[in-house]
Regions:
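Serine residues within intrinsically disordered or low-complexity segments
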Residues: 7, 28-31
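Bacterial N-terminal signal peptides that target proteins for export
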Residues: 3-19
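Bacterial N-terminal signal peptides
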Residues: 18-28
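Compositionally biased, intrinsically disordered low-complexity segments
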Residues: 1-3, 14, 25, 42
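Intrinsically disordered, low-complexity regions enriched in Ser/Pro/Gly/Gln/His and often acidic
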Residues: 9-10, 25, 120
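Sequence/structural signature of beta-propeller domains
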Residues: 32-342
Length: 342
């Protein structure tokens, strides 16, 4: 696939990430590596005497009315298509532009202030979404080059990279360079337009939701670099990954997706409202997507294609494909039955 690049050695995942770490150090900036953490694996289990544990999703969060809280100061962000809350830089968000833009990530804070520009060594046919995830002790970003309005592309690409540290102020203003692991892939059932991608922190699996004007859409999954099933030497354009359909959702025109930092909730966004799915501790996401999503009213916005849980995994943030780019917040009603896990 044009523009795809693979970082690191070809002697296995360990060698590739060692090479990537060296490249990051040579570029004089650090990635976000911290203490052991992340979501617990989604596995089956039992109570005393081996009795199965009841599948009980977390209680619903009560959200308040969404409103615009800022405009993004960086005027280059004129088609914010993906949005993600940092897993290691407190109060930092990430976004990127839609098709026609460079493979570039923008960092900003809740006030809309620019905190840096980062060029990714990757291809960029039509970036449509991104995700942030913390797996064990390291935070990662995923950029999804998956747009295909006319379903003509034979192959698509995801770009996986360690999340860099971001300063509280934008310096230097010159874009910094980031290496990325390319994940070329195909769908098991042909070409699809897609604008929604997320990563499960419990398993490292990547989820994609197709964009259709019909009443339904499909959820697909494929392994990420840290997931079970990832080949030792990764994937290539000649041997791409295969995205497999695992669920059908009764939602038209899906434009965005996110999975909460604890791996228990998923948002599926549209140009209007969003739908929230909750996963019990012993459930898989395909099982959780088998239930109806909870419809959430989102603030009115023009061409809203970015959605993300906040850093705490509770409040919801949104952007729009217009300049100056607005930042919306849907807060949590703390004095209500706020949905804390039991």
């Amino acid at each position: 696939m044009p523009g795809q690049r693979r970082s690191g050695a070809k002697a296995g995942r360990t060698g590739r990430w060692a090479a990537l770490a060296f490249a990051l150090a040579a570029a004089s900036f650090a990635s976000c590596r911290g203490a052991e953490g992340g979501a617990a694996p989604a596995t089956g289990g039992g109570g005393e005497g081996g009795e199965p544990i009841e599948k009980k999703p977390p209680a619903p969060i009560q959200y308040g009315e969404g409103k615009r809280i800022a405009h993004l100061a960086n005027g280059a962000i004129d088609e914010s298509s993906g949005l993600a809350a940092s897993r290691c830089n407190p109060g930092v968000f990430w976004t990127h532009n839609d098709s026609g833009g460079r493979p570039r990530l923008y960092a900003f804070n809740r006030k809309g202030e620019s905190l840096g520009v980062f060029d990714v060594r990757a291809g960029a046919i039509d970036w449509e979404d991104m995700a942030a995830v913390k797996i064990k002790e390291t935070s990662y970003l995923l950029a999804a080059d998956v747009g295909d309005n006319f379903s003509l592309r034979g192959q698509y690409a995801l770009y996986w990279l360690e999340e860099p540290e971001v300063a509280e102020e934008e310096k230097p203003a010159v874009p910094r360079r980031l290496d990325a692991e390319a994940i070329p892939f195909v769908y098991e059932d042909g070409s699809h337009n897609c604008e929604a991608a997320a990563v499960d922190p419990a398993t490292g699996a990547i989820y994609l939701v197709s964009k259709r004007k019909a009443a339904t859409c499909k959820v697909y999954t494929l392994p990420g670099p840290l997931a079970e099933g990832w080949p030792e030497d990764g994937y290539t354009a000649g041997e791409p990954a295969r995205a497999v359909a695992v669920a059908t959702l009764r939602i038209p025109t899906v434009t965005a997706m996110d999975i909460s930092p604890d791996g228990r909730r998923a948002l599926v966004g549209t140009y209007a409202d969003a739908y929230e799915y909750a996963r019990a501790e012993d459930e898989t996401w395909p099982e959780a997507f088998g239930r109806e999503g909870r419809r959430l009213a989102m603030p009115a916005r023009r061409k809203g294609e970015g959605i993300s849980y906040g850093p705490d995994g509770r409040a919801i943030y949104l952007t729009s494909e217009y300049a100056p780019c607005p930042l919306f917040e849907v807060p949590v009603l703390e004095n209500k039955a706020d949905g804390k896990d039991e």
